[in-house]
Amino acid sequence: MVNDTISDMLTRLRNAYLADKEQTSLKATRVVKDIAQVLVQEGFLGPIEQEENGFFTVNLKRGVKQFERVSTPGVRVYANHKQLQPVLNGMGVAVISTSQGIMTDRKARALGIGGEVLCKIW
């Protein structure tokens, strides 16, 4: 049983990229689905496919170099909109959990809201 589903998601994606897979399965939780949708909108992942047996499949796109978990269950990291810095000079994206849902750091800065910094992808 996995306690940290976000770390599990990032590890599955990282391993699939390193193994040159075209798709991988992720645990179907609300947070993981929301993060995957943000990554699809930002162009880091391809379309999300059908959910089955508690898992859903995502198609991978080439070009992703790194996945980094920022806020962990033991050490939560929060930032307001002024503290959110661009990832890799705007080439990457930070995924933020805000009061208005899960979104990118760019969108959170534009809306002037902060939240928990879940992960960074570049």
UniProtKB/Swiss-Prot annotation:
Origin: domain of life: Eukaryota
InterPro entries assigned: Ribosomal_uS8, Ribosomal_uS8_CS, Ribosomal_uS8_sf
PANTHER family per record: 40S RIBOSOMAL PROTEIN S15A (PTHR11758)
Function: One of the primary rRNA binding proteins, it binds directly to 16S rRNA central domain where it helps coordinate assembly of the platform of the 30S subunit.
Assembly and interaction partners: Part of the 30S ribosomal subunit.
HAMAP family according to UniProt: Ribosomal_uS8_B (MF_01302_B)
Entry similarity comment: Belongs to the universal ribosomal protein uS8 family.
Protein's recorded name: Small ribosomal subunit protein uS8c
Species assigned in the record: Ostreococcus tauri
